[in-house]
UniProtKB/Swiss-Prot annotation:
UniProt organism field: Mycoplasma capricolum subsp. capricolum (strain California kid / ATCC 27343 / NCTC 10154)
GO molecular function: mRNA binding; rRNA binding; structural constituent of ribosome
UniProt-listed SUPFAM superfamilies: Prokaryotic type KH domain (KH-domain type II), Ribosomal protein S3 C-terminal domain
Record keywords, A-Z: Ribonucleoprotein, Ribosomal protein, RNA-binding, rRNA-binding
Record-given protein name: Small ribosomal subunit protein uS3
GO cellular component: cytosolic small ribosomal subunit
Gene: rpsC
Role: Binds the lower part of the 30S subunit head. Binds mRNA in the 70S ribosome, positioning it for translation.
Record text on subunit structure and interactions: Part of the 30S ribosomal subunit. Forms a tight complex with proteins S10 and S14.
Signal peptide: none
GO biological processes: translation
Domain spans labelled KH type-2: 39-108
Gene3D superfamilies, sorted: 3.30.300.20, Ribosomal protein S3, C-terminal domain
Length: 233
């Protein structure tokens, strides 16, 4: 069953936390969920050069807090916090509320080579630039294991090398037990555009076992976040 379900979803409440953390009544739930999707889309576009892996959102009726997980915190913060102001304005524009209190917490990724989202994105970008799909997968695996990953699995699907028949090729190094729920498996999917069509890239990275029943939130697995409120440092 571990092969059929997203490892991220399968581990919610065990070793992973939800990306959206708030409570809303029925009439408000759909509105906030739609806003969260639009906020992430806008911010990933705004911060496309900042190597952003994940954006978590916490809400109350009066304020909204963003947890931006990135390998380049300096780019997200900007000179004298100018990019934070842009992020706050983008969020307020998306939710159509100029008075909303927006808090931004930037969390630095210590090992970007062991982050599934960044690894999948890097493999996809290299394939889009006509690099060998076999070479980039092997290089990504080597870097991930060197960065401390217990195991990594990669797979690319589509018209690989421009051939007529679509196929899937991948590699596995180390241990990646998808059905062991106490294993913190990081999973990501990326679609790489090429002249022959879309190439799907999947990455699974095993960060080891978590024996205590605790949610892996940002404060537990990352360094102390940097906080900015209302667009000011």
């Amino acid at each position: 069953m571990g092969q059929k379900v997203s490892p991220n979803v399968l581990r919610l409440g065990i070793v992973r936390d939800w990306e959206n953390r708030w409570y809303a009544e029925k009439d408000q739930y759909v509105k906030w969920l739609d806003q969260d999707i639009k906020i992430r889309t806008a911010l990933f576009k705004l911060l496309k050069d900042a190597a952003v892996s994940k954006i978590d959102i916490e809400r109350t009726t009066k304020d909204l807090t963003l947890f931006i997980k990135t390998a380049r915190p300096a780019i997200v913060l900007g000179q004298e916090g100018k990019n934070i102001e842009k992020i706050v304005l983008a969020v307020r524009k998306t939710v159509k509320n100029k008075k909303l209190i927006v808090n931004v917490r930037v969390i630095e990724i210590k090992s970007p080579d062991a982050d599934a989202t960044l690894v999948a994105r890097w493999i996809g970008e290299q394939i889009s630039n006509r690099a060998s799909f076999r070479t980039v997968q092997k290089l990504a695996i080597k870097k991930a294991l060197k960065a401390g990953a217990k195991g990594i699995k990669t797979a690319v699907s589509g018209r690989l090398g421009g051939v007529e028949m679509a196929r899937t090729e991948g590699y596995l190094e180390g241990s990646v037990p998808l059905s062991t729920l106490r294993n913190n498996i990081d999973y990501a999917l990326y679609e790489a555009p090429t002249t022959y069509g879309q190439i799907g890239v999947k990455v699974w990275i095993n960060h080891g076992e978590v024996f205590k029943k605790e949610r892996m939130n940002n404060s537990q697995i990352m360094a102390k976040p940097r906080t900015n409120k209302g667009g000011k440092r």
